[in-house]
Amino acid sequence: MAVYFYGCITLDGYMAAKGHGLDWLYDTGSPEETSYDEFYSHMDVTLMGRRTFQEIEKTGDPASVYPTTENYVFTHRELSCPGFTAVSGDPAEFVKKLGQDRSIWVVGGNTILAPLLDQNMVDCLIVQVAPVLLGEGIPLFT
């Protein structure tokens, strides 16, 4: 098992705007510049929180965003989106149950990442920095 965090923050350390928006992210870097496609091609599983999933829903077709991975959303709500499974509980315990032969991408957010970091379960942090200043927002590390 290998657990990765791959994401982008602003120059002032935020991974999302104050209202959890990611508009700033969509305006920076192409897939070629960020090596996103290469990274994603090696992943088996994505993990994300509800707010990250809500941003993905705004695309209109969330299943097309992560079409080749098993996708889990930590939430206490039901999901009606094909290709995504709602889960709850401790992210570290959940990851332990996924199996050894998996490449797991923690898409976001910090409430999913922090417990995994606390238990030294993250094998690789890939943090890209966008030339953007938000002034306030949701930090990657709290």
What are these model-derived regions, one by one?
Residues 1-142:
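Enzymes that bind and transform nitrogen-containing heteroaromatic metabolites
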